[in-house]
């Protein structure tokens, strides 16, 4: 393993932590309708568990309304149950093979709870980033021990790894701040 591949791997894995964090945040309600709100939900379909978007189309016809068009009418009940039991506080209205889901206003208590969840997701992303940093540092120490790089180069590269870590954590904090303001905005 050479230095360039180590640095590329670190960058890719840290970017992956940010992508995963953004995906987690996408599932949090902000008061505006978003199809990503229902994407993490699963439903049992013919003996296997699949995501809702694999058995239905999810669209946003209005800012405070989700519309779910289920492809198979035998799945409507299961999709409705999955949405009701999701803990998102949503009550779908069934109309044939379609579900209309009005999004109620978030109260202050629920907003604070969502912010707390967002902070938890951010901390998970930071921890993942630090784990990647530790792996990178271990690889650099191994290269130095094996004599593939010198002590000065190892020190310089560890500073680059730390800088990359700091930038990634700063990006996570920026994304969190934006999401927090979205959640708290009435």
From Swiss-Prot:
Molecular-function GO terms, alphabetical: ribosomal large subunit binding
Primary localisation category: cytoplasm
Signal peptide: none
InterPro entries, A to Z: Ribosome_recyc_fac, Ribosome_recyc_fac_dom, RRF_sf
HAMAP family: RRF
Family: Belongs to the RRF family.
Name the record gives this protein: Ribosome-recycling factor
